[in-house]
A protein has these predicted regions:
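Non-catalytic alpha-helical scaffolds and adjoining flexible linkers that form interface surfaces
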Residues: 1-249
């Protein structure tokens, strides 16, 4: 079959044999794909840098029976700043594993790819709290993949933002005001600022998802809810999660 060119982000690399790598790549038109990068672990290989973890590269791929083969690869962005801290690396590993688990296979994933790239850029720039980046990615990814919570108003009384506390049900994805949460025997897990941020993350256009401010206290609530919501809807645990929590509790 004829080779073709695509942009792609390396979400995972697995050593195979002496110097080969099997790559999990997120692409804009084919979603998540698997590709063999032969001899890419050799320092003199032209594929060495472009096939590394978190590398955004231009790949020339040859279709195969079970996976693609990387014929050529040229680096576009390596996100150098990600590796400058253990917290940044652990978060990047978590986000890319989450993206690999939730992004489609064999169909368009341009928005998912853009979100991962933007998140890695934010990590590498060291200007935004890592907990904000994590919460934004979790909530936006779930929303993009069809798991957006029903956050416009209280499920039971339809109030929009009356009161100072709210409850988001991670399993069912619905919102309750403080009064309705009490009637249902639930303890509120969001304050008004955290709810505002949650709505912002899920509903605004892509280029504005990080454009909000939040206090430390409200961020703690948002972070807990975002993480619980994302992990509740995954089919299996993420291997990177325990490591992330050990360095970024």
């Amino acid at each position: 079959m004829e080779p073709f060119v695509t942009m792609g982000l390396v979400l995972k690399e697995t050593r195979y044999r002496e110097a080969d790598r099997i790559l999990t790549i997120l692409t804009p038109k084919l979603g998540v794909i698997t590709a063999m990068a032969a001899n890419s672990l050799r320092l003199k290989s032209k594929l060495f840098s472009a096939c590394g973890l978190f590398c955004y590269s231009e790949f020339t791929l040859v279709p195969g029976r079970n996976m693609y083969t990387v014929r050529e690869a040229e680096v576009q962005n390596i996100f150098h700043g990600v590796s400058s801290s253990i917290e940044g690396v652990s978060l990047a590993m978590y986000l890319t594993e989450l993206a690999a688990a939730l992004s489609p296979t064999g169909e368009e994933a341009a928005r998912e790819l853009r979100l991962v790239l933007n998140s890695l850029y934010m990590i590498s720039e060291h200007r935004t709290d890592l907990r904000v980046i994590k919460a934004v990615f979790e909530l936006r990814t779930m929303s993009e993949c069809g798991f957006m919570p029903q956050i416009v108003c209280c499920r039971d009384c339809s109030t929009y933002d009356e009161g100072d506390a709210f409850y988001l049900d991670a399993q069912e994805g619905h919102l309750l005001c403080a009064s309705c949460a009490a009637k249902a025997g639930k303890s509120c897990n969001l304050d008004k600022a955290a709810l505002f941020a949650l709505r912002h993350i899920c509903l605004v256009e892509d280029k504005k998802i990080f454009a909000f401010k939040i206090s430390v206290g409200s961020l703690a609530k948002l972070s807990a809810v975002a993480e619980n919501y994302a992990l509740t809807h995954l089919d299996k645990p993420l291997k990177s999660y325990a490591f992330l929590k050990s360095v970024l509790p």
